[in-house]
Swiss-Prot record:
Sequence repeat boundaries on the chain: 33-54, 60-81, 82-103, 115-136, 137-158, 159-180, 181-202, 203-224, 225-246, 247-268, 269-286, 287-308, 309-330
InterPro entries membership: ApoA_E, Apolipoprotein_A1/A4/E
Role this protein plays: May have a role in chylomicrons and VLDL secretion and catabolism. Required for efficient activation of lipoprotein lipase by ApoC-II; potent activator of LCAT. Apoa-IV is a major component of HDL and chylomicrons.
Entry keyword set: Chylomicron, HDL, Lipid transport, Repeat, Secreted, Signal, Transport
Cellular component terms per the entry's GO annotation: chylomicron; extracellular vesicle; high-density lipoprotein particle; low-density lipoprotein particle; very-low-density lipoprotein particle
Chain residue ranges for the region called Disordered: 362-382
Quaternary context: Homodimer.
Signal peptide interval: 1-20
Protein name, per record: Apolipoprotein A-IV
Keyword Disulfide bond: no
Amino acid sequence: MFLRAVVLTLALVAVTGARAEVSPDQVATVVWDYFSQLSNNAKEAVEHLQQSELTQQLNALFQDKLGQVNTYADNLQKKLVPFATELHERLTKDSEKLKEEIRKELEELRARLLPHANEVSQKIGDNVRELQQRLGPYADELRTQVNTHAEHLRRHLTSHAQRMEAVLRENVDNLQSSLTPYADEFKAKIDRNIEELKGHLTPYADELKVKIDQNVEELRRSLAPYAQDVQEKLNHQLEGLAFQMKKNAEELKAKITANADELRQRLAPVVEDVRGKLRDNAKGLQESLAQLNSHLDRQVEEFRHNMGPYGDTFNRALVQQVEELRQKLGSYAGGMEDHLSFLEKDLRDKVNSFFSTLKEKENQDMPLALPEQEQAPGPLES
């Protein structure tokens, strides 16, 4: 069953990665995904999870991955799966309730802002234009950096391949001993250059989050005079907007990382082919090296092509989200699933809090405990 696999994965990720500081966002994504995908079958799936079979499988999994289960891992195992199950139960129970609360919140906001509808629409429009002006240079800079660092990677790797060709010409009678160190170094160079590429490009997502916070705060200040007695409700909607916009920034970072890792994977087979030909004749190896050069050019160009639109696509997504807020605060009633972003935000906040508690308890060398574990699950706060 899908949910069983997800929670097994959740436990494995947390346990095997606990010492490597696994990201709470990674765990929250797993929980949110199974909440989203299971839909109407969630209740039955959660009940199935609580059967003894799950405990047996998790015990076997922990033993397989960790050998002797230490106290920390054992406590984590006992806390994580119930926590994930409880979160899912809360999500399932509170989804419709929150949906109604958001509907009422928007109704009150629209009623309060209605006398100033034109001014509110104008302020949001101004904010959209400021957002476009802020983000435009980032899209251009990202594209420039992609081209610059991809070209640097291509030149660096091509230079190494050319050195291998030169060594081949000079050591035809002793290929394996002469070229094996170069082949090993080439693979290491690919890994280093890919990591450097990611290191140069992924910080853009964090910079964009800062711009998002600035833009949303300016929007809040510009709308505050029109929402004096419903400021808390406006703030809540703007928090939801910022959350959605930052999700786009995280997705941009994930796409950059995924494309860089895919480039690494596409280069690996040709490098392995060269290594495999070290035992063969010089002609076969020379052909493999020639293929390596052309393969490098082709794969780096494909990487640049794939990355090219990401900045502009990100900008359009953010502008669209601000425009959707303008529609929700106007006559448009809003989408049927507006509440889901708030539900997901609350989920991620709770997972972050849970992991903070785990870390604090571990640092204090105290038994792990889920806050309010003995109390009945309460509703997600909106």
